[in-house]
């Protein structure tokens, strides 16, 4: 699981999700990538699930890059707790994703298998996304 080793503050505010990604919008490491088409908080479990889906489909001979990192804590209060008495404890770590951001990149010799692997990963994510190649831009 991806979580930060050390953070300055355990709890953070939750900003509004607006605007488009200013960086990380093109495929720079691999040949194919998954590009977000909307806003979302993607948890560390969802990132790991998508990574496993890609690796299981391509088996060997390819390389996967994860371009996002869950660095924001989301808090939650326990069930059946009255309102007040402070903010809840951190439950998940999420990555704040904006439209245009490339989430995963893949380098694999066979295009058909690479696209199928990325499609399986997209189904694991709570966001609309598309497959882009190195030549395409947002």
From Swiss-Prot:
Pfam families: Ribosomal_L16
Signal peptide: none
Key words of the record: Ribonucleoprotein, Ribosomal protein, RNA-binding, rRNA-binding, tRNA-binding
InterPro entries: Ribosomal_uL16, Ribosomal_uL16_bact-type, Ribosomal_uL16_CS, Ribosomal_uL16_dom, Ribosomal_uL16_sf
Keyword check for Cytoplasm: no
The name this protein goes by in its record: Large ribosomal subunit protein uL16
An annotated GO cellular component: cytosolic large ribosomal subunit
Job of this protein: Binds 23S rRNA and is also seen to make contacts with the A and possibly P site tRNAs.
Subunit and partners: Part of the 50S ribosomal subunit.
Region (Disordered): 1-24
Transmembrane residue ranges: none
Record GO biological process: translation
Any one GO molecular function term: rRNA binding
Biased composition (Basic residues): 1-17
Designated gene of the protein: rplP
HAMAP family associated with the record: Ribosomal_uL16
Family named by the database record: Belongs to the universal ribosomal protein uL16 family.
């Amino acid at each position: 699981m991806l979580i930060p080793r050390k953070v300055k503050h355990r709890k953070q505010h939750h900003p509004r999700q607006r605007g488009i990604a200013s960086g990380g919008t093109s495929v720079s490491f691999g040949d194919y990538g998954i590009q977000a088409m909307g806003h979302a908080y993607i948890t560390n479990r969802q990132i790991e699930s998508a990574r496993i889906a890609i690796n299981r489909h391509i088996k060997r001979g390819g390389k996967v890059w994860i371009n996002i990192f869950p660095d924001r804590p989301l808090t939650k209060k326990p069930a059946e707790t009255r309102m007040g008495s402070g903010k809840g404890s951190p439950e998940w770590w999420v990555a704040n994703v904006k439209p245009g951001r490339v989430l995963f990149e893949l380098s694999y010799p066979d295009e058909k298998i690479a696209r199928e692997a990325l499609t399986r990963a997209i189904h694991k994510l709570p966001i609309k996304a598309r497959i882009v190649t190195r030549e395409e831009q947002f």
